Amino acid sequence: MTGQLIVLRGNSGSGKSSIAVELRRVLGGQVVWIEQDYLRRIVFQESEEPEPVNARAIEQLATLALAHGRNAIVEGIMPVVRYGEMLRRLAAAHPGRVHCYYLDIPFEETARRHSTRDKSAAFTAEAMRDWYRERDLLPAPRETIVVQTSTLDETVARILADLSRVA
């Protein structure tokens, strides 16, 4: 049995990690959470490389998890210019179901949310503005857009409903 691939993309402060944490809480051991920022900054100590090594690691970890019947959450900013091809390949190679979500949150809201996080001391809202990419959507696979008005609970419920829907 193969797991389901869940891709959560969006700008810093858009709520990706909060969604991943809640999905993992609800789904328990069925989920492998692959966090792009952790692999990029901590494991590989990369800045924004044109062909990041962490992208290959994300692809390999997700493929391994899915092949062993686990659901894989691939979560991160993952700009299309650096990660789009890897995400397209990952989705195309997966024989099971693929669910991609883009959190389309305005910069002002991401900056406000950032000010409430523990990691707000690690970088400023001004730095976030440099990274912000408006509607950086994948050409393929198609992403479901999650808008600012969707609460954490509503977004998680929507994803859980998508996961339980019969293909």
Where are these predicted regions, by residue range?
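Hydrophobic anchor at the beta1->P-loop junction of P-loop NTPases
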Residues: 8
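P-loop (Walker A) phosphate-binding loop of NTP-binding proteins
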Residues: 11
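ATP-binding Walker
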Residues: 14
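Walker A/P-loop
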Residues: 17
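Conserved substrate/cofactor phosphate-moiety recognition/catalytic segment
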Residues: 21-67
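Glycine-rich phosphate-binding loop used to anchor ATP phosphates in small-molecule kinases
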Residues: 53-95
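Conserved phosphate-donor/acceptor-positioning beta-strand/loop module used by diverse small-molecule
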Residues: 94-113
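Small-molecule kinase domains that catalyze NTP-dependent phosphoryl transfer to phosphate-bearing small molecules
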Residues: 116-160, 166
